[in-house]
Amino acid sequence: MHNTNLKYFTSPLNSTTLASSAMLYHSTLRSSSPKSAICGRFSGKSQQVITLSSTGNALYLYSHDGDTGTVTLIHTHLTHCQVREIRAFRLPGLKKDYVIASSDSGVISVLEFRHNRFVSLHKEAYGRSGIRRVVPGEFLAVDPKGRACMLASVEKSKLVYVLNRQGADIVISSPLEAHTSCVTYFVVACDVAYENPVFAAIETPVGETSPGKQLVFYELDLGLNHVIRKAPVDIPNSTSHVTAVPGGTDGPGGVLVFSTNAIVHHVAGAAGGASTGAAGSTKIALPKPAAGYDNVIVASALHQSRDLFFYIAQNTRGDLFKISRDSETQHWSVLYFGTMSCVCTSLTILKSAHMVCLSEQGDSHMMFFESLGDDDAPENVYDVISPSPYLTVTQTLFELKPVFDSVVGVNTTSSDHVGPVPNVLSLISATRGGLKLISHALKPSIIVASPLPEPPSKLWTMRDGAGSDKYIVLSYANATLVLEIGDSVVETTSSGLTLDKPTLHCGSVGSSYVQVMTDGMNVIPMSREGSSESLPATKWTAPSGQVICASSSSHQVVLGLTSSLFYFEDTPGSELSAYDGAYELSSPPTAVAVAPVPAGRVRSPFVAVATDDETVRIVSVDPESMFETVAVQGLMATASSLALLSVGQVLYLHMGLANGVYVRVELDPLTGEIVGSWSKFVGLGRLSVVPVTCGGEESILVSSRGVKTCLGHVNATSDTWVPTGGNSAPFFALDAISGEPLDLAHSFHTQDCPHGVIGVAGSTLKIFTVNTAQKWTENEVKLEGTAKRLIQHDATTLTITQNPDRLVSVDNGAVGITKDLGGPPTSICEVMFGDGKRYFAVGGSRDGSPGTSGTSGYISIFSSSSLGHVHTTEVEAPPLALCAYNGLLVAGIGSQVRLYALGLKQVLRKAQIELSKRVTCLAHFAGSNRVAVGDIRQSVTVCVVLEEDSGHVIYPLVCDKISRQVTCLFFVDYETVALGDRFGGFTMLRIPSEASKLADEDHNAVHLRQLEPTLNGPAHFRFDHVASFHIEDVPVAIHMYNDYLVVCGLLGTVSAFVPVVSPKQSRDLKTIEKFVCASDPGLMGRDHGRFRGYYVPVKEVVDGDMLREVLVMDEKRREEVGEKTGLGVEGAVGRVVNVMKCV
C-alpha cells in the first residue's frame, strides 16, 4: 500500500511585491490578429485555412466547414520570430499542401503540418537576421505548380529558388540571383502551366533622373538554371496592386496591374527572349463611384475552376468588384459587387464558394457567394450598396486590432448576458467602432435554456441501450423529477424510477437503470420502457445504516454507507449482483468514484473513496484482490466530489475539495498507486467534479456552486498546453467557463448533440457545448465613433470617442449617457479634487488633429454622478495625458507637466515644469508625491511634487539612461515603473535607493534645488535597469491583475509578466529555457535571444512561450533537456507547469 501526503505547489505570487522578484515570467495570453491567409489541404484532408498574425509571431490553422461556411481554430503555433510572408504550394504528385515562409531570421523555411503540429522540413539561409531593406523576405511568390519561388527585398535583392523532391523529402536549391538597382513594390508568380516559371515585379529603378514604376518579368530557365530579366514596361506611378492571371489552357496568362481608376492586363513576352517585355496589354474599364472618389485597389482574390475564373477586388473604401473574362469573346468586364464595412488586408476564395476576408481594422468575416451576378450588366457609374447583395456573412471572426486603450478586471457583462467570471482576466479594449469586451474563459454555446419550478439538489442523465441519453433526472428534497428526451423534453412518470423520494445517484448499468436512495438501490430493466409488460424492478436494501454516496459505470456500481463500502457488478450474461462482504471504513464516506470500463475489459480494477477524515483511498475491486487498499492520500480538506477518468493510457483521479481546491492525481493504471498530483484553487465553496465529453475528448467539469465553473480538458493548441503529470502523460488544461456559474452539471449525449453538457444555474436548466480551442469569451459594444481612451468608474466604463467627438458611458453592455465635446479628445481620467467629490477630466484638441503643430487644446470637467458639464479650460496645446494626484489634476501639455486645482469657472494652475519633449503619458503612485512622466523621445522622468510656502513645486528626480519613445506607463510600486515603447519593448525601471531616500527626507527641497541635470536628461539621478523584453507589439496599456502585469498591444496582443520570487526557481527556469532554445532552432531558425532582445537585450525575463516547448516536444528531446538541466524530465516539466498555473 502506498501512503503519501499531498503536496501543494506554493505560488511565486506571495506577499513580496512584483518589483522585488528575482525574475519575471512572460506568457503570451493572446496573439495578435491575423493579417494574411492562405488555403490548402495542409493535413491531406479537407480544405483548411492558415492565417498569419499581424506581428508575424503566430500561425493559426483553421478547419473549414463547407456546409455552414464557418472556420474553427484547431491549432496555434508560436513561431518565436517575425514571419514576414507565407505561401502555400504543392509539388506535382503530392496529395497535400506545404507552406513556405520568410522571416526575420534570414532563413526561408518549408513547413509541413504533421501530428497536429507544424514542423520544418527544410531551412535555407539567404541573408542577415532582422528586417532590412536590402535583405530579401518582404515579398514571396511561388510558382502555381510549386516548382520555384522568388524572394525579394524592398531594395535591390531578388533570389529565386527551385523546389524539388528528393525521395520523400522536399529540398530547396541554392539561390539564383536576380539583383537589380531598384525599389520593389510587388512580386507575383505568373501562371505559365509547365513552361519555364515566370515572376512579375513592380519596380522603380534607382539612379535615374525621373524614375517611374515599371512592370518587369523574370523568367527562370530550368534548363540553364539561370534567371532572365525581361525588358521593363512603364506603368502608372499610381499602381497599387498586381495579381496573376491563369495561363496555359485556363486563360491568357500574364498579370492584372491596378492603378488609380484603371486596370491593365499585361501578357509576358515569348519565352527565352531576354529583351522582350510584355507581348501585349489590354485596358479594362473600372466603374466609377457616383460620389466621385478615386478607385485605388488594395486587395484581390482569384477563384479558378475548370471552365471559368474571376477575381474579387477591393478598393480603399471597401467597394468590391468582380473582374471576369469571357472565354469566347475574350472580353474583360468589371461588375460592382457591393461594399464591405471594412478594408481587407487579405482576400481568399475557397472552393466551397466562401471567401475569407481579413480586415485591416476590426472584425474579419467569412462570406458566402449567394450569386455571381452573371445576369447583371456592368455599369460605368455605381452607387454604394452596403451590404453586398451578392455576399452574405456566414461567420464573424472577432478581432481586437487596433487597440488604443484598455481596462482590466472589470465587469464585462454584455447585451447577450455572458457575464464575468470571478478570478478570470477580463479586458475592455478601445477599438475602431466600439468597445471590445474579452474574458480569458471558454464561451459556452447555449442550445437550450429552460426554467425549472425550483432549483434541484442533484442532476443526472441516463442513456438507453443505443448509447444516447433517454432521461434527465432531477432530485429535490422530497421527490424526484424525470424528464424524457425526444423531439422535445417532457416530464414522464413511466421511467420506472421512484418519484416520491429524493435520489442520491442515477445511472445506466448494463441493460438496466439504477436509482440509489438513502435506504438502498432500485434496478430497473431497460426493456421495461415502452413495453406493455411490466418487468419487475429489483430492490436492494441497505443492511445497516444509510447510503451516503454512490457511483456507477457501464458495468459497476459502488455504494458508500455510513461505515462500509458495497460493490456491485454486471457481468455479461448475468444480472447486477452484489459482491459478498463489504469494505469497512474507519470514517463515514463523503464521495466515491468508479472509473469507466476500459475497452476490451469487463471491469475497472479500482474505485476511489473519500472519507471525512480528509483522506482518499484507492481500493482494488479485482476478484483476485478484492477490497485491498492500494493507496492512501492525505488531503488538506474533505473531498466533496470524486471522479476517475482515463485520458489515453493514463488514469486520473479528480477531486473537488470542500475548501474550493481542485486536485488531480495520476494513478498507475496497473497497480493503482499514486504517481503524481496537481492542484489549483478554483473558488470558495465545495467543488463538484463531473466527467463530460467536449470536442470528442474526455473532459472534467469542475464547479463551485454559484461561484465559478471550469473545464479540464486535453488542449488542442500548443500555446496553452498544460501537462497533468509524468513525462508520458497527455496535456491537460483547466479553463474557466464564462457566463452564470453552474450549480449542477452532467454530460449530455444525443444524436443532435453528441458532445454536450447539461447544467443547472439557479432555477434554469441549460444544455450547451464548449469549443475548447476558443480560449477567450468575446463581446462587443458598438459606438458611433472610434474609442480612444477608457477609464472604469464602479461598474460603468467611460470612454472618449473621435468622429464624433463625445464622452460616452457604457453600463451592462449598453450605451448610457453621451456628452458632446468641443474637439477631438485625447485623454481622460477620474479625479477627486479638494471638495471630496469625484469628477471626470477630459483633454482634447480644439483645432483638428492633436499632432498638428500650433493646435490649441482644452480641459473639460464633468461630474461623475450624471456627467454634468462643470466647465472647460482653454490651454495652448492638447493635453495628451491626464492623471489624478492627491486632490489635484496632473496634465501633460506639450512639453510641460502642470498641476491643476478645481476652480469655479476653470481649473487653476498650481505648478508646472518644462521637460525636453512632448509628454505622452502620466502615472501616479497612489498616496505618494511621485509622478512618472513619459515623453515621445526622452523615455521616463519621475518627478516629486512638494508643497512649499509659495505653493506646489515640481522637481525632476530621476530619468532614464537611454532614450525610449514611451507609449504607456504604470507604477508597479513606490520605486518601480513599468513602461512600453513604440518598438515593442517592455521595460521595468527602479529609482535608486539614494534618490528615493532623498525625495522622502528632503521635504523642504533644500537638496533637490541644488541638483543639476546630467547630460542628456532633465534629472540628476538615473534609473536602475530592472528588466526588459520584446513583446512583438506596441504596448498601449499596462495593468496589474492578481499580482502580475498584463500588457495589451496595439495589434491585439495580450501578454502577462508574472513575478518569480524564488532565486532557485528563477535559475531553473532560465536553465530550461537555455537548453530548450539549444535543442530546437524553431520553425524559422531564429535566434531566440536576439528576437526577444530586438532593440535592448533581454534582462531578468524568462520566455514562457519558449518554456512551453518542453511540454509539446518529442520524448527524446524532452529527455535530453531534462538530462542537460540536471532536473530530469519530471523536474523540468513540473517547474514549467508550476509557473504556468499562475497565469
Swiss-Prot record:
Cell location: Nucleus
Main location group: nucleus
UniProt keywords, alphabetically: mRNA processing, mRNA splicing, Nucleus, Spliceosome
One GO CC term, this protein: spliceosomal complex
SUPFAM superfamilies (alphabetical): WD40 repeat-like
Residue ranges the record marks as coiled coil: none
GO BP of this protein: mRNA splicing, via spliceosome
InterPro entries per record: Beta-prop_RSE1/DDB1/CPSF1_1st, Cleavage/polyA-sp_fac_asu_C, RSE1/DDB1/CFT1/CPSF1, WD40/YVTN_repeat-like_dom_sf, WD40_repeat_dom_sf
Pfam families in UniProt: Beta-prop_RSE1_1st, Beta-prop_RSE1_2nd, CPSF_A
Gene Ontology MF terms in the entry: U2 snRNA binding
Assembly information from the UniProt record: Associated with the spliceosome.
Family, similarity comment: Belongs to the RSE1 family.
PANTHER family: DNA REPAIR/RNA PROCESSING CPSF FAMILY
Role this protein plays: Involved in pre-mRNA splicing.
Protein name: Pre-mRNA-splicing factor RSE1
Name of the gene: RSE1
